[in-house]
Curated annotation (Swiss-Prot):
Family: Belongs to the peptidase S12 family. YfeW subfamily.
Location(s), subcellular: Cell inner membrane
Residue intervals passing through the bilayer: 7-25
Main location (coarse class): membrane
Gene3D superfamilies, A to Z: DD-peptidase/beta-lactamase superfamily
Protein name, as recorded: Putative D-alanyl-D-alanine carboxypeptidase
Organism: Salmonella heidelberg (strain SL476)
SUPFAM superfamilies per the UniProt record, alphabetical: beta-lactamase/transpeptidase-like
Family matches, as HAMAP family: S12_YfeW (MF_01034)
Keywords: Carboxypeptidase, Cell inner membrane, Cell membrane, Hydrolase, Membrane, Protease, Transmembrane, Transmembrane helix
EC number, UniProt record: 3.4.16.4
């Protein structure tokens, strides 16, 4: 009896001795971790000038050596109602939640895939058809290749799919039109390839819509429930969700985006298009109309603190505190440069050549990786300098510059703040 008790105690102690305890974020002054505070402070005035010039809002957080050294909000979470400037606009705070747009691809879909790969539940060399029944070449397809498409081809964006089929817009999608999730999967299967897989690189939302469906096939639960219960909740994240208005959040907690729904100030029309100022609903058309707000390519909302924890997970090699999601080998596998394009890992954008300067600036290490989002979001993770930066913004919350010429260019998108690399360089330039 005594021997059994002693053995149990020793075994428990032995296991606890080998338990991984990852670094967690604490706060520190910039000077404590190698920044020149005076130089870093110059960024404050420059960003405020951009807000004064019309950029809606910017939330910025900087991590260095496991410490949060800068966290600040500028501007307004909501300043317009339609085309009307509010008499009392709602200021952005460091707790404001933002539509992450394509950063969803990394912090929902990639995090889920990295976890599933680590757990041995999926291999990136598996065929897509293993998880999506009916995903195959059709007799009338001009370009074949779906039968042999692997998950790694999807992650590298070399799978042959078009960049944006615009499924919810019948005027553009034609026979591929869909405004329901179940129909959308069938339309994706029918979407013709635009090029022979592996022959070129085209960044495609369809790729990550497919990956979202694959995750749901493996886990047998919706994508949002999987990431919210197995990733965000264990990490203690309270402001990272899909469809926030359905999960207890209110519009004033969230940054607004486009002024007139998805109409680009009245020049785009399709059935069921939103026309009110978007506030708490995902901006992305495919995510909202075709996927019910939850998709592998867009739909996630978060704030800078929660994003900081997720970036720290990557810097830590897969965990945070006593939570382990995946390991450092998985991180290395997913952030390794693609042979087809040095600026891509497995989904992650990588600082592989000068074309990434507008994203990562000129001072970040070549090993830096992250992603951008159409709404005005950037994440930059630098394992060499043990540093990470998140910029959250609501760039579409401004008028369209010239709707008839280019409906996708907003007034705020013409300002220097729309180029993340400049902000990133000011931060790196403040290092001693």
């Amino acid at each position: 009896m005594k021997f059994t008790l002693v053995a149990t105690v020793l075994l428990t102690f032995s296991l606890s001795a080998f338990a991984v305890e990852y670094p967690v974020l604490t706060t520190a002054s910039p000077d404590q971790v190698g920044f020149d505070s005076q130089k870093l402070h110059r960024l404050d005035g420059w960003i405020q000038n951009q807000i004064d010039a019309g950029y809606p809002s910017i939330n910025l957080l900087v991590i260095k050596d496991n410490h949060i050294v800068l966290q600040k909000a500028w501007g307004y979470a909501k300043k317009y109602d339609g085309s009307t400037l509010l008499a009392h606009p709602i200021r952005a705070t460091t707790n404001t939640m933002y539509d992450l747009a394509s950063n969803t691809k990394m912090y929902a879909t990639n995090f889920a895939l990295q976890k599933l790969v680590y757990e041995g539940k999926i291999d990136v060399n598996d065929l897509v058809s293993k998880y999506i029944p009916g995903f195959k070449d059709m007799p009338g397809d001009k370009i074949k290749g779906k039968n042999k498409l692997r998950i790694i081809d999807i992650l590298h964006h070399v799978a042959g799919f078009p960049a944006d089929p615009q499924y919810p817009n019948k005027n553009v999608a034609g026979k591929l039109f869909s405004q329901s999730k179940s129909t959308t999967l069938e339309m994706i299967k029918k979407t013709p390839l635009e090029y022979q897989p592996g022959s070129k690189h085209i960044y495609s939302d369809v790729d990550y819509m497919i990956l979202g469906f694959i995750i749901e096939s493996i886990t047998a639960i919706p994508l949002d429930r999987y990431v919210e219960t197995t990733i965000y909740k264990p990490l203690g994240l309270k402001h990272t969700v899909f469809n926030p208005l359905m999960k207890g959040f209110t519009p004033p907690q969230i940054a607004a985006t486009e002024l007139h729904g998805n109409t680009r100030d009245g020049v785009i029309h399709f059935p069921n298009i939103r026309t009110n100022t978007l506030w708490g609903q995902v901006h992305d058309e495919k995510a909202w109309y075709s996927m019910g707000g939850v998709s592998g390519h867009a739909g996630l909302f978060s704030d800078t603190h929660d994003m900081a924890v997720l970036m720290q997970v990557m810097l830590n090699g897969g965990g945070y505190g006593n939570v382990k999601l995946f390991d450092d080998k998985t991180v290395a596998q997913f952030t390794r440069r693609s042979p087809e394009d040095a600026t891509f890992g497995l989904g992650w954008r990588v600082n592989g050549n000068a074309s990434m300067t507008p994203t990562f600036g000129v001072l970040a290490s070549p090993q830096t990786y992250g992603h951008t989002g159409w709404t005005g979001t950037l994440t930059s993770i630098d394992p060499v300098n043990h540093m990470a930066i998140v910029i959250l913004g609501n760039r579409p919350h401004s008028p369209v510059a010239n709707p008839k010429v280019n409906p996708n260019v907003f007034v705020s998108g013409l300002l220097p703040a729309a180029t993340y690399g400049w902000i990133v360089d000011q931060i790196y330039g403040s290092l001693k």
